């Protein structure tokens, strides 16, 4: 048996002897070398595959919070995942968030998480910036995951503030100071999920580090304007506000959910100058995507477009049939040609979906 690299993904060639002849078959195998057998490896932040500077991250205008698709048994569907990432590259996205909220990092083991970051780097790291979500409400876990993420080659880390077991402002500063020295970092402020706002004082303190690439900000455009006036790079974390954030409040771009579905249109929204007509055209889709907590609607939409299997890791479940029917209408209004995939959009029945509780 021998191995080879095709498109930077791992393939294995088997030699098979039959009736005195020898033939070779090639089959794809997931990059097991990237799987960390023990989470607590003695890696250090200087042991990295790629060395990226914060300025390289600061320039990105369209970053997609990429979806993680699944096989019927709940394991990662890497073939579908690779298709999703390739479609982002082909349609002009400059970066992907791996294992974020949209990618359901909260439903992954750390072994899965680091493997997926490493796989994305190995297959696509030369074509798109790979930003690994290695944040945690435990500083200890955030340190270990970030060390390992940089060790397998991610270009930057995404860090949320500690949630549920909230800490003081001094605790927030200490938490972020523990991970910032490792490499380029985006701090993610989403109080609706964490229960705690990261105030500007904390970000201003973190901005003293050369590794702070910027902030993914979900509080609103007043906060975006405050940071941009202070010279802090900001990405809008709200798709429905990103056009105004970009062109009226100085945001560098967006870290987007909607771009999973219409990456080309989202690129146009971020690169092409003010375009209120396009923004209005996309607004029904954006509102539909966030009718229920993300990523429920996105998972449903990608399944209806036929680009991922209709498999959900619980506790996420698909949208109601009425909302699935509404999505078909939205696709027709925007134009099927603007969405990823080649199949006609479908209205899936309830029994088409697979819900996996053990994964």
Curated annotation (Swiss-Prot):
Biological pathway: Amino-acid biosynthesis; L-lysine biosynthesis via DAP pathway; (S)-tetrahydrodipicolinate from L-aspartate: step 3/4
GO CC entries: chloroplast
Origin organism lineage: Eukaryota, Viridiplantae, Streptophyta, Embryophyta, Tracheophyta
Transit peptide location: 1-33
GO biological process, one term: lysine biosynthetic process via diaminopimelate
Task performed by this protein: Catalyzes the condensation of (S)-aspartate-beta-semialdehyde [(S)-ASA] and pyruvate to 4-hydroxy-tetrahydrodipicolinate (HTPA).
Alphabetical list of Pfam families matching this protein: DHDPS
GO function terms (MF aspect): 4-hydroxy-tetrahydrodipicolinate synthase activity
Source species of the chain: Nicotiana tabacum
Entry keyword set: Amino-acid biosynthesis, Chloroplast, Diaminopimelate biosynthesis, Lyase, Lysine biosynthesis, Plastid, Schiff base, Transit peptide
Domain of life: Eukaryota
Feature type site, description Part of a proton relay during catalysis: 101, 164
EC number: 4.3.3.7
Catalytic activity: L-aspartate 4-semialdehyde + pyruvate = (2S,4S)-4-hydroxy-2,3,4,5-tetrahydrodipicolinate + H2O + H(+)
Subcellular location: Plastid, Chloroplast
UniProt similarity note: Belongs to the DapA family.
Protein name, per record: 4-hydroxy-tetrahydrodipicolinate synthase, chloroplastic
PROSITE patterns reported for this sequence: DHDPS_1, DHDPS_2
Broad class of where this protein is predominantly found: plastid
EC supergroup of this enzyme: lyase
Catalytic residues (UniProt): 188 (proton donor/acceptor), 216 (schiff-base intermediate with substrate)
Binding site for pyruvate: 102, 255
């Amino acid at each position: 048996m021998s191995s080879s690299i095709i498109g930077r993904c791992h393939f294995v060639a088997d030699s098979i002897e039959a009736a005195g002849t020898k033939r070779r078959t090639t089959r794809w195998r997931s990059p097991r070398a990237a799987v960390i057998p023990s989470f607590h490896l003695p890696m250090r932040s200087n042991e990295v595959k790629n060395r990226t500077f914060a300025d390289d991250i600061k320039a990105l205008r369209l970053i997609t919070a990429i979806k993680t698709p699944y096989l019927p048994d709940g394991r990662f569907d890497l073939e579908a995942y690779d298709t999703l990432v390739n479609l982002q590259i082909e349609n002009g996205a400059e970066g992907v968030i791996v294992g974020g909220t949209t990618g359901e990092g909260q439903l992954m083991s750390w072994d899965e998480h680091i493997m997926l970051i490493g796989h994305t780097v190995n297959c696509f790291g030369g074509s798109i910036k790979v930003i690994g979500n290695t944040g945690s409400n435990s500083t200890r876990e955030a340190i270990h995951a970030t060390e390992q993420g940089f060790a397998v080659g991610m270009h930057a880390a995404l860090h949320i503030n500690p949630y549920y077991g909230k800490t003081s402002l001094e605790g927030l500063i200490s938490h972020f100071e523990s991970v910032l020295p490792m490499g380029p970092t985006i701090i993610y402020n989403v109080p609706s999920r964490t229960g705690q706002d990261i105030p500007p004082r904390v970000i201003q303190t973190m901005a003293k580090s050369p590794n702070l690439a910027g902030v993914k900000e979900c509080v609103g455009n007043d906060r975006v304007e405050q940071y941009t006036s202070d010279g802090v790079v900001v990405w809008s974390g709200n798709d429905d506000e990103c056009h105004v954030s970009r062109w009226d409040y100085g945001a560098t771009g967006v870290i987007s959910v909607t771009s999973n579905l219409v990456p080309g249109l989202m690129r146009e929204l971020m690169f092409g100058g003010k375009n209120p007509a396009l923004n209005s055209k996309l607004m029904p889709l954006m509102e539909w995507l966030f009718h229920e907590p993300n990523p429920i609607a996105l998972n449903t939409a990608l399944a209806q477009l036929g680009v991922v299997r209709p498999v959900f890791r619980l506790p996420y479940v698909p949208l109601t049939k009425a909302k699935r029917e509404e999505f078909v209408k939205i696709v027709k209004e925007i134009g099927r040609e603007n969405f990823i995939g080649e199949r006609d959009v479908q209205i899936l029945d309830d029994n088409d979906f697979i819900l996996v509780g053990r994964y």
